[in-house]
């Protein structure tokens, strides 16, 4: 299927809001990490807390609302790696989307 | 520890579910690296198959369900537990398009059973969530289920069988229409019953199920067998006129509700 021609023939308009929502959903999913017996989101809040804590072990509430004891540095390193990879890809795809305006 | 996927496919007078299952199974093999077991009936088997399944289980389908004036063979999903030869199984609808390895993450979740409770429509992301009825539960989705062979998972599937066999009774209690059997509704009730009338957060897949909805079509951007880029087009009705809208997506799994669109996709 030649989708470019299809779009021209159908006089279809690009829907930015739906495209943005799809990107957000897609990359939010990739920020989810199962590690050390818990389920985590590699988000700014969790990364900041793990960076600020001083002890080797910390107890965090995971996405399933269970308290889980984790090795702070190992989890921090995994979440930072995931966050930086995913956000880079998200930003790249979002930049391509913005060019369609 | 064995892992695999299970699909159900029974041809109806209108749609060839077997060929849908072949299309989906190839993508499961490619993106998830999992073997696929098909549960089907003798009459759905093609003369020249397009794909070699890991296993084919032949069963006698229950054809006692009508939707849009056509037989819709969707009953018997509870048999997945007994027929799955795997320790850990992903049970998928045949119209689910796998475009990534995302589903493998469900095996890492600390649970023996999980499914989706939230959906998003690709061209209508803020659409309200479906409920069984105005005074009942938010619908769970049987489109994607991950289960492990445990006593609890077996109990959930037994509850699913019980709800299917007493569907009218549950429809009366929860005020939904019993005319068409829906696996989603049966699952919504069965999972709660098995959990002591509550829903556990760990039984929910922690991302949304994406639908390509009724007025929406997905077109592959290339003829590559394992293409992951699509143009999704939507008929937006405004003041009595259709305005076509589209987005481009890539590397994202989605469930196609529009069967004509899915058939076009597999025949491209």
What residues fall within each predicted segment?
Chain B
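GT-A fold catalytic core of metal-dependent nucleotide-sugar glycosyltransferases
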Residues: 73-124
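Class I SAM-dependent methyltransferase SAM-binding "motif I" and its flanking Rossmann-like core
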Residues: 115-127, 131, 136-139
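Active-site-proximal specificity loops/subdomain of glycosyltransferases
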Residues: 45-84
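Conserved hydrophobic/aromatic beta-strand scaffold that supports enzyme active sites
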Residues: 80, 144-146
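Short, polar loop motifs at secondary-structure junctions
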Residues: 39-46, 96-100, 205
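Short, acidic, metal-binding catalytic loop of nucleotide-sugar glycosyltransferases
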Residues: 27-34
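A short, glycine/small-residue-rich beta-strand->loop->alpha-helix junction that serves as a flexible
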Residues: 12-21
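A glycosyltransferase accessory/donor-loop signature
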Residues: 1-7, 18, 38, 51, ...
